UniProtKB/Swiss-Prot annotation:
Protein task: This protein binds to a specific region on the 26S rRNA.
Provenance organism: Dictyostelium discoideum
Stated family: Belongs to the universal ribosomal protein uL23 family.
One Pfam family linked to the record: Ribosomal_L23eN
Keyword flag Ribosomal protein: yes
Protein name (Swiss-Prot/TrEMBL): Large ribosomal subunit protein uL23
Keyword tags: Ribonucleoprotein, Ribosomal protein, RNA-binding, rRNA-binding
Amino acid sequence: MAGKKVKSNTPKQDLSVSKSKLTSIKAPAAAIKAKAAASAVKKGVSNKSTRKVRTSVIFRRPVTLNNPKKPAYPRRSVNKITKMDQFRILKAPLTTESATQKIEGSNTITFMVDMFANKSQVADAVAKMYDVKVKRVNTLITPRGEKKAFVTLSPEFEAADVANKIGLI
């Protein structure tokens, strides 16, 4: 059967297209295309965007939207209390002879303070405890490893009055 031709029952169709029909098919499509191109030229191209000029060789990632967190429940039920309150910061006032001279001479009260307290914390603690305005605080660490603070009061407050209130003099 490989060598034999099988005749089919369907008649052959002529699929060739005459030249006159070909031009008539192509002509309307070309006219439509030309019309569309003309209207596009008339309107102008609106989506033409210019490229941003890069002035740096380093690429910095753009800052993206960062929404604030909205937790379903608080992770810490109670806020931490500050351990550095005025009672922990100020350990004791100094009552040595040189400390009393500073009270009389330079309006300064000397305190032994907590090792981890800084100058602003010492100033706030003195202001809160004794209702005075602090001008400046000098600190030093003693050879014994303790911190000493020299608290100079502002001129409208007398260090002698405050020392009297504490019980130094």
